[in-house]
Amino acid sequence: ATCVVIKGHGVLLRGASGSGKSDLALRLIDGGAGLVADDYTELSVEDGQLFACVPQTIQGLLEVRGIGIVHLGCVPRVPVAAIFDLVALSDVERLPEQQVETIEGVSVARFAIRGLDASAPAKVRMALKAHAENLFHST
């Protein structure tokens, strides 16, 4: 998984190779997010909170397809606020129920989006805001 931080909230980006994890991370970073870890993220639980950490061997490195591996500053450890699974368009529900995933006993909001969509960075930010402020409308 790749992880970025947006306003102190860790966002895990998961998906198969080529699903757009690093690309979406790059677009989020270009919009003000910070890099935590690209391609591999260590997870741990402390006081009931899930944390994402960067392995030292890849600290500050981001793979940019077509450019190469670039050195960036990074945030080495953040609390995880949400998980985004990057899936095929056919696997994205139009009006999904709110979902959570339990990792090491901690429940985390989970969303499924197409990572290569132009709107993917906006969807990540919107979902974080809606989750944090309880803005979801029940269908």
For each feature predicted by the language model, list its residue ranges.
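Conserved NTP phosphate-binding and transfer environment spanning the P-loop NTPase/kinase superfamily
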Residues: R77-T139
